[in-house]
Design a protein with these regions (language model features):
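Long C-terminal interaction/binding lobes of large macromolecular proteins
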Residues: 102, 129-198
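Residue-level signal for pocket-adjacent positions within structured domains
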Residues: 28, 43, 56, 68, ...
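Cys/His-rich Zn2+-binding cysteine-cluster or related metal-binding knuckle/ribbon modules and their
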Residues: 2-8, 17, 27-92
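Solvent-exposed alpha-helical segments within well-ordered globular domains of core cellular machineries
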Residues: 9-13, 27-31, 42, 46, ...
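Alpha-helix N-cap/helix-start motif
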Residues: 41, 117-118, 149
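Conserved, well-folded catalytic cores of nucleic-acid-processing
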Residues: 14, 18, 36, 51-54, ...
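Extended interfacial segments that mediate partner engagement and assembly in macromolecular machines
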Residues: 26, 75-143
């Protein structure tokens, strides 16, 4: 027997389907939303709809933005000769929090994982190679230190080496299997500063 009515159950189920939200958190959020003033609920719903309709990938680095180019790629003060390659937008945000990286990014939206059927053509490697046609001096590979992240890093390194562009990998300090989005800013900064040539 269901404890709650259909609308409450539906809201809980939809919230629980989000990553990182378990059934208890979904229940807590659902009750919070139900108890919010109607205007706030409408504003929340509108902001979700607006984000879904207007947010897209930056035409240059493929992070999420609501413009053709994201604020980082549009910023002329950034070092456009250095590209940091990350697996997802959350990893980009983690490095931006350090406030020390002055280059630009390239978001792959995944990592090579033969076990999951994800190959090089399933992530944004072709677009990365197209970006290297411009004036690029260094590519910093900042994929996660998981098996998939390491596989992706080695694949990218082999692709770029023949171009003569310097390819580096963030240093250890990031635990094996660790996701960058959960690493503190100091550790990320040390990993960036201690990067090694591949």
């Amino acid at each position: 027997m269901d404890l709650y009515s259909g609308y409450i159950n539906q809201l809980i189920e939809e919230l629980a389907a989000l990553p990182g939200i378990g059934s208890k958190s979904a229940q807590r959020l659902a009750f919070h939303i139900i108890n919010m003033p109607k205007g706030r609920v409408e504003k929340l719903a509108r902001s979700m709809t607006d984000a879904k309709e207007h947010v897209r990938y930056c035409e240059e680095c493929f992070t999420l933005t609501d413009a053709e180019k994201c604020p980082i790629c549009s910023n002329e003060k950034r070092d456009h000769t250095t590209i940091m390659v990350v697996e997802n937008t959350r990893d980009l945000a983690a490095y931006e929090k350090t406030g020390k990286y002055e280059g630009v990014y390239h978001v792959l939206h995944g990592a090579i994982s033969p076990m999951l059927g994800i190959g090089p053509n399933d992530i944004r490697l072709k677009e990365l190679m197209q970006r290297l046609q411009g004036e690029v001096d260094e590519v910093i590979i900042a994929t996660n230190s998981s098996l998939e992240g390491e596989t992706t890093a080695m694949y990218i390194s082999k692709l770029i080496k023949p171009t003569g562009i310097r390819v580096t990998r963030i240093a250890s300090g990031v635990p094996v299997g660790g996701d960058l989005e959960y690493i503190d800013e100091v550790t990320l900064l040390r990993a960036l500063e201690g990067r090694v040539d591949l």
